[in-house]
Amino acid sequence: MKLVVGQQVSRSLTLTTRHVEIYAELTGDRNPLHFDESFVRATGKLDDLIVQGGLTTGLLHALVATDLPGPGTVFLSQNWKFTAPVYIGDTITAQAEVLSVHATKPVCQLRVRVARQTGETVLEGEAWCYRFA
């Protein structure tokens, strides 16, 4: 696929307790913010259990590797920030827009954003990608 500045794509996922459990099994991230409702309430800062940040960014990895730029693509660098927690049960939508395409190398710069079902941004930033294929 030839990339064009301004090209955009998105993909969505509803995050469940099972996603959080599988991610914890794979990574060992068993932070009580993801599993212990009493702990979360005691913080006084969160409404409910939150998902691991890696689940949120993982949707961006899927988007880049599958949709845009597509198969054979990896991140070279990422500069993003989490702007709000993502709760179990949220439907998040990852979006990417091509900001620049290198003239002679399979490299591009993307603007990325992840939003929850209410439209609230939960992550935003930029990333550079390299496409092997």
Can you say where each PLM-predicted feature lies in the sequence?
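Short, surface-exposed, charged/polar-biased interaction segments
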Residues: 30, 41-44, 61, 67, ...
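HotDog/MaoC-like acyl-thioester-processing domains
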Residues: 1-5, 86-133
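Generic structural detector for well-ordered beta-strands
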Residues: 10-14, 81, 128-130
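Hot-dog-fold acyl-thioester-processing enzymes
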Residues: 1-73
